[in-house]
Structure formats: C-alpha cells, structure tokens
C-alpha cells in the first residue's frame, strides 16, 4: 500500500510539503497519526487520518473515515488532497489549514466522504490528470542536454564552468537566463 500511495502522489505540487504514512497495524509504528495523510490497516480495511503534524507544533491527525476498501481509500485521499490544494493558502500546512477551516474536520468529512459540494468527481479527475501526466523532472534533466548543462560539472573543483553564469540583481546574484548568459559570455 505504501509504495502504491508514494507512486500515485509523487510530484504533487501543493501549498506545503505533504507527508504520508502507512501503518500495517494499530501499533502504528509508522506514526501515521502525525502526518498530513495517515493510513492504518484494520481487520476490515483501512482507516484514514488527515491533517496531523510533527515538529514545532505537533498535532494528532483527525480520523476522516474508517474501514475503507482500497478503492474508496484512494478516492478519499484524492479528494482530500485536491480540496486542500485548491483551498489552502501558500505555505500553509494541512494542520493549520484544518484549524482555520470553518467547520473543521466535519466540513472536510462532508466534502470528501459525502460529496456535499458536488465536486468529488471533479477532484478525483484533477488528481487522475496529475497521475496520468506525471513526469520525473530529474529524469528529464538528465536526459535533456540543455537542462543538464545548467548543473555544475565538478562539485569539488574551483575551476570556472562556462555553463554556469550569474548576473547581479538587487545586490545579489542569480542564475542567468539564456539570453543573459549569452551576453555575459560574449563580454567575458
């Protein structure tokens, strides 16, 4: 289950990083109740917890649904994540988002499990579009010479690399855009 979840949601752009966990039993060794999405196996299926948090402001996740079959579990996670992505503020963790959401976990449960807003199919379709179009950006960087040239060739060398050019902006340096790079190299 954990591998399926990881593969399904990899590369998902969200207001803040998303942490997930799957525990195979109620001993909860993977600490699923401290994650944004936590899944715990039961004798009848899966329990789904959401909006947990560790770190500076720890918060136990809230139980969203119990004894779910795998298909329903994935549908609820799809809906939850897409609803969070659509409605959360930039850099807002799921735990803070839930605290600020009028109606709290009951509202989320109504939207995700009972489809109270009538957007469940749309949220699932949005997630499926993400899954279907996922492309590993690092693999693309390695396989595309133009992108690969943007990375430093020798990490343990002080020798200059003509592929890496910086320009000054507001008292700091930043990587040059392609047209700026050409101008800098021509003037050097």
Question: Where do the protein language model's features map onto the residues?
Answer:
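Peripheral terminal and linker regions in Fe-S/redox and tRNA-modifying enzymes
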Residues: 1-188
């Amino acid at each position: 289950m954990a591998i399926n979840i990881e593969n399904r949601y990899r590369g998902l752009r969200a207001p803040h990083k998303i942490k997930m966990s799957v525990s195979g039993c109620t001993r909860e060794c993977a600490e699923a109740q401290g994650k944004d999405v936590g899944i715990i196996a039961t004798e009848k299926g899966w329990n789904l917890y959401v909006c947990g948090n560790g770190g500076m402001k720890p918060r136990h996740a809230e139980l969203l649904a119990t004894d779910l079959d795998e298909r329903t579990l994935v549908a609820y996670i799809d809906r939850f994540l897409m609803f969070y992505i659509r409605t959360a503020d930039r850099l807002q963790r799921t735990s803070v988002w839930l605290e600020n959401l009028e109606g709290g976990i009951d509202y989320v449960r109504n939207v995700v499990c009972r489809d109270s807003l009538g957007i469940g199919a749309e949220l699932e379709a949005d997630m499926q579009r993400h899954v279907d179009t996922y492309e590993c950006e690092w693999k693309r960087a390695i396989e595309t010479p133009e992108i690969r040239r943007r990375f430093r060739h020798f990490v343990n060398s002080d020798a200059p690399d003509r592929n890496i050019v910086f320009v000054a902006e507001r008292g700091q340096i930043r990587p040059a855009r392609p047209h700026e790079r050409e101008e800098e190299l021509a003037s050097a």
